[in-house]
């Protein structure tokens, strides 16, 4: 058979493109060329004649026109349907060509400033932008950022009022994605100053203004997503796509930014105050989760100024944000009790209920996250805030003079000619392969006189005068003086350190973590959210947040006064024990009614009660008389000793009786096999696993001890009684056998005959070779299944469980207990199944 060339392999379209390109240059029609089916394939396969034509400036300009021009006319097709407009097809093909992985096209565009200016004039269009056009524009420029990073970044930084132009289209998601792509190019190992430049252009403050409660909610939600994305890519981690802490994320937690944000969130008279509150809380939550100081590789408390000078890549400090939000707790409490938007009763299948509302839920969620933040070690340290203030003061001075260590590049330490150079200097290209001055966790190099070179040139980032070598050396000496308390050395330099009075005043303030807990106690935060737990019995999102707060309070280190005070407040003011009992009684009344059902909070109520009981068991010796009266109350004791115990037992009960593994064995066995428990090692192991899962560690050891003794004695005396495991198996098997009716036996026989007939029919159409292969596969499958079927006991794998035995128990135990335990471990490690009593 012969293929007709030109149809199956695309030669026809290729020849058509060649025919168009063979025409005189002034007769080539770009539109006609783009309408050919194979033009994209030819472009991506690097057709030299096609690329030569496409790389011409006038052709590239026309391709850009196809992307930018708007043609909203829709021409109906002949059959009355809708046909894709011609201009839409041309825009798509033009964007695919400009974003194709062809180096010559990318280079021809980026190096032609006229073309780039024309392309970026798209931002000058009046909004709202066409979403399809915006996606094409973003796609092309993201490709340019990937392939020609330095040139594209340099061009973007040359655009006048870039931040204003791009935020003019904040409601267009494709444009915001392009902004995030631009920021993400400023990685730690190849930092090119994008974050610092956007900081100097006022990006964060411009975004923040769009979160005003007087701005349209759709714009607010889009801007909030952009800010959260900036926080995510600025996290202090080594994950792919993360650029690390930077000037933008640091500005987000500054006093000015947080003050403005809290004012927006609490402006109840504004038309869209609820939207501002919801978005503000989501931003704060993202800040806390992405900047947990407990996970910093180098904690700030271990970064003295003389050995770790501040950089823009230092970990983000959340103390200022936490203090400002703690001061606003009274305002948030008013909104929680009386939100700006009240919803009517909502009909459900079980009656009308009062909806919680987004404002209430977000405030409760904010409380939980602020509590998480207050428990960070840095925010619980008395010296943490003062130390961070000194670092921030020095960092601001260095940044203003464009000499912060973030912008320095250092070569290998062993290189005698190693120098520091500014990222924006003319000599940057000569040092672009050198290592960065610090990594993403804020570590900075030792700055010495030999390797210091701070000669800078003009840059778009800052107009400040660069500091000289002597000034920088003075600053470093001042940093050392601050660290060692040398006031004389600090006064001899142009750099003015923080006054000692400011530092002392900061130390006199309550520790930030404790300050939040004090505000919680004074404003009855815990009692309020506990009331909401029972007022909204069907909102499981709220129940989960309340449980999070309770377990944080009760599991915090109680050696700190405010942690213990907050826990006591939960009992005294929050009356958590009384409310748990009340919730249980209310649920019992509902269940007792005809067609009654459990309250929606009962699952969380049980685990909250478990946390309370655990706390009481650990710290009851420190309780005062009022607390003792609460926990010794008759209703509470009855709940703990009866209701809660019954609930635990019910929750731990196997719903289906036997475990699925044992049920499977029972179904596959006939009556004769079922009566002989000792011939069923698989079933024996399944029962052993069940006993282990439902018994204590001591019970498991006792079972193994009896198994080992019975196994050794079976050879000597066949008349011995069965061991406990065999007795349990025989009991279960006899119970199953006794309940099997004649109908069940007939069903088993029918299934057996049906299976035999099916097997015989299948064997008629299979060869002996196939049978052998099938047997091999079955053997392999069984061996694999057995490997997974007999896992080693978790009790013996986890060595920590062995330490649960007290010293007295070890002394009172028999000498053979260790041998028995070793025997059981050896049996498990060898993958054996314990068989006895054949």
Swiss-Prot record:
The modification Phosphothreonine is found at residues 419, 493. Keywords: Cell cycle, Cell division, Mitosis, Nucleus, Phosphoprotein. The modification Phosphoserine is found at residues 411, 418, 425, 459, 468, 491, 494, 711, 713. The keyword Signal does not apply. The keyword Lyase does not apply. Residues 690-700, 714-723, 768-779, 806-818 have a biased composition (Acidic residues). It comes from the Eukaryota. Interacts with ppe1 and mis12. This is Extragenic suppressor of kinetochore protein 1. The lineage of its organism: Eukaryota, Fungi, Dikarya, Ascomycota, Taphrinomycotina.
């Amino acid at each position: 058979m012969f293929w007709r060339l030109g149809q199956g392999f695309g030669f026809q379209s290729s020849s058509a493109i060649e025919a168009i390109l063979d025409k005189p240059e002034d007769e080539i029609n770009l539109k006609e060329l783009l309408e050919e089916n194979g033009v994209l394939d030819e472009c991506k396969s690097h057709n030299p004649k096609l690329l030569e034509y496409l790389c011409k400036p006038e052709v590239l300009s026309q391709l850009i026109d196809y992307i930018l021009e708007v043609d909203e006319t829709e021409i109906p097709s002949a059959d009355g349907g809708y046909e894709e407009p011609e201009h839409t097809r041309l825009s798509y093909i033009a964007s695919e060509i400009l974003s194709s992985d062809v180096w010559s096209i990318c280079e021809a565009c980026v190096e032609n400033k006229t073309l780039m200016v024309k392309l970026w004039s798209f931002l000058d269009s009046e909004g709202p932008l066409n979403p399809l056009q915006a996606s094409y524009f973003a796609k092309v420029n993201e490709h340019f950022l990937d392939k020609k990073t330095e040139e594209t970044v340099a061009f973007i930084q040359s655009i006048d009022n870039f931040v204003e132009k791009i935020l003019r289209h904040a409601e267009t998601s494709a444009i915001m994605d392009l902004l995030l792509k631009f920021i993400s190019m400023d990685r730690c190992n190849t930092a090119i100053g994008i974050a610092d430049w956007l900081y100097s252009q006022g990006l964060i403050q411009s975004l923040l203004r769009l979160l005003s409660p007087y701005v349209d909610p759709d714009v607010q939600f889009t801007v909030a997503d952009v800010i959260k994305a900036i926080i995510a890519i600025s996290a202090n981690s080594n994950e792919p796509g993360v650029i690390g802490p930077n000037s933008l994320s640091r500005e987000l937690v500054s006093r000015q930014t947080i003050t403005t944000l809290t004012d927006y969130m609490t402006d109840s008279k504004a038309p869209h105050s609820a939207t501002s509150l919801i978005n503000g809380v989501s931003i704060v939550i993202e800040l806390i989760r992405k900047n947990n100081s407990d996970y910093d590789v180098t904690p700030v408390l271990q970064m003295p100024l003389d050995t770790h000078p501040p950089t823009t890549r230092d970990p983000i400090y959340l103390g200022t944000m936490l203090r400002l939000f703690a001061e606003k707790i009274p305002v948030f409490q008013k909104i929680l009790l009386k939100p700006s938007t009240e919803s009517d009763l909502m009909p459900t299948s079980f009656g009308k209920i009062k909806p919680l509302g987004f404002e209430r839920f977000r405030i409760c969620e904010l409380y939980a996250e602020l509590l998480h933040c207050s428990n960070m070690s840095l925010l619980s340290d008395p010296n943490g805030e003062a130390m961070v203030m000194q670092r921030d003061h020095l960092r601001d001075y260095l940044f203003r003079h464009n000499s912060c260590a973030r912008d320095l590049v250092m070569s290998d330490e062993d290189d005698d000619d190693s120098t520091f150079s500014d990222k924006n200097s003319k000599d940057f290209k000569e040092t672009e392969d050198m290592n960065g001055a610090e990594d993403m966790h804020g570590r900075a190099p030792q700055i010495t006189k030999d390797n210091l070179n701070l000669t800078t040139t003009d840059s778009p980032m800052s107009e400040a005068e660069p500091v000289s070598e002597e000034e920088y050396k003075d600053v470093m000496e001042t940093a050392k003086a601050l660290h060692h308390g040398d006031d004389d050395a600090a006064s001899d330099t142009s750099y003015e350190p923080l006054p000692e009075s400011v530092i002392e005043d900061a130390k006199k303030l309550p520790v930030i973590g404790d300050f939040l807990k004090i505000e919680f106690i004074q404003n009855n935060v815990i009692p309020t959210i506990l009331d909401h737990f029972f007022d909204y019995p069907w909102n499981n999102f709220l129940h989960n947040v309340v449980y999070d707060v309770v377990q944080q309070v009760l599991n915090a280190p109680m050696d700190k006064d405010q942690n213990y005070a907050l826990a006591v407040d939960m009992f005294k003011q929050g009356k958590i024990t009384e409310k748990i009992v009340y919730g249980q009684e209310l649920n019992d009344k509902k269940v007792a009614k005809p067609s009654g059902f459990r309250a929606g909070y009962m699952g969380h109520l049980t685990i909250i009660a478990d946390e309370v009981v655990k706390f009481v068991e650990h710290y009851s010796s420190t309780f005062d008389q009022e607390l003792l009266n609460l926990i010794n109350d008759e209703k509470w004791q009855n709940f703990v000793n009866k209701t809660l115990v019954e609930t635990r037992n019910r929750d731990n009960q196997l719903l289906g009786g036997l475990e699925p593994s044992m049920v499977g064995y029972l179904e596959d066995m006939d009556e004769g096999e079922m009566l002989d428990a000792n011939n069923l090692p698989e079933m024996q192991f399944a029962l052993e696993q069940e006993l282990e899962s439902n018994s204590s560690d001591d019970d498991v050891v006792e079972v193994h001890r009896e198994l080992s003794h019975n196994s050794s004695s079976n050879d000597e005396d066949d008349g011995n009684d069965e061991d406990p495991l065999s007795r349990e198996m025989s009991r279960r098997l006899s119970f199953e056998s006794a309940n099997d009716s004649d109908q069940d036996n007939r069903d088993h026989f029918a299934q057996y005959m049906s299976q035999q007939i099916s097997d015989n029919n299948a064997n008629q159409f299979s060869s002996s070779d196939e049978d052998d292969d099938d047997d091999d596969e079955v053997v392999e499958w069984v061996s694999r299944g057995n490997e997974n079927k007999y896992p080693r006991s978790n009790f013996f794998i986890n060595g920590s469980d062995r330490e649960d035995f007290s010293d007295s128990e070890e002394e009172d135990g028999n000498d053979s207990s260790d041998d028995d335990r070793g025997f059981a471990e050896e049996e498990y490690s060898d993958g054996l199944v314990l068989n006895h009593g054949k």
